[in-house]
From Swiss-Prot:
Residues 83-112 have a biased composition (Polar residues). GO terms for cellular component: transcription factor TFIID complex. Disulfide bonds: none annotated. Its main location: nucleus. This is Transcription initiation factor TFIID subunit 4. Residues 247-323 form the Histone-fold domain.
Amino acid sequence: MSDSDGSKRPSETPDAADSDSKRQRGSSKSPVDVDEELNAILGANGISELEAASGNANQQDIMDIDFDNLPAELLQKDDIQADRNSVGRSTSGSQTPQPIKSESMINVPQSSQISRPIIRPAMPSAPVVPSSSAPVNRMNPLVQQANSIHGLNTSSIDNRTAPNFSTGHSTGQAGGNNQDRFHTNDPSKLNDALAAAGVDIGREEELLQQQQYNRAPRINVQQPSYLQSRPARQIQRTPFLNSYHLGTFMQRVARENGVLQSFMSDNELLELMSASCEQWISHIATKTVLLSRHRRRGIPALKNKKLAANQIPRSEVSKELRNLALKQKELEEQRVSRRILLGLENKDANSESNKVGAEETLHRAANETAAMMTSNKKKYSWMSSGAGNGDDSKAMEREKDKQSHLLALRGDNGLRFRDIRTGDSVTMKDLLAALEDERMGVNKAIMKGYARLKD
């Protein structure tokens, strides 16, 4: 066999026969030379026909011819590889895959020894089966979820397609079964993940509905009706001071200080001032009551803790006042004795003038004693039962012994303890003492209080 250039090709050798047998067994592991394949399949007549079809057999390479004219038996080989450029194959549909020439293959420099390209087949890809429906966003509650579970994201499962394990495309009943298999709009068919996890969709929906039903009555019970809450709100909103009078007073004070502002329309400010005044007055009243209690109740003495049943506890203030009265009594006795020495007083107690004065004094004392017996006012110690055993009776006897006959002629029956006439009431002194501890806004009030104070 001779080529187009006149060179003779060697006859087939045992190695060529072995390669032919391997090719027939379908081995695709070792690359195969294109020239050997052409020689083995076409023979001398086939090659000459290809050269004649190419039009330029002397200058054009055999592989530069149109690949469409090659026999289908050569193009269906799976063990063809390319040593320089990779060649792709088209696998769309059921058409016969054909090799594709690249520009680098065409621009191969002409030389005496040209390496033949070895073509490798591309992996067959499965045909893409278009989905019957558009993907549904199951996480969006506004999208209509037909025959599906609300809130369950199954978009990734909806987009799944059944793999085509056959070389051809799937038709007929097989495609319908695959679509029914991966269709997730029916909750009963989600058995791949939910059943394995042990989730019962129907039971979960019933529990959610039951929880929402149980929450509704509790919310209604906690919220009171308008008729029940209206009186309480009105009581809380009642201000301590009248809003009109408070706003008028604040506007007058602001005008005196050069501020032109109307406070009548600002209700929040009026409520704040009313609450502040209430707190300040409460503080002053509490402090006044405490001072009045301290004034009426002194520090208890450590001695004579056990008092008689009819004995009245005396305060330290009453005792001090009594001591001052005793000193004044002694000074008065000294003054009367000096008047007697000067002849200004009668020493004789049995004179007529002294008897008349003593009778008037006794008559006045008798009337006062009768009034005490008929009323609930303070009584003398001798008017109460068992008074002879008390300490007050002994004190009265000592007072009688100390009593001067000169003062007795004037109707002085001796000194007694001065109890507080105000009782448990709060006086102006207590209020002024409470205001004196304040720092601001009390100067005028203190001056007016001391001006009106009566001893």
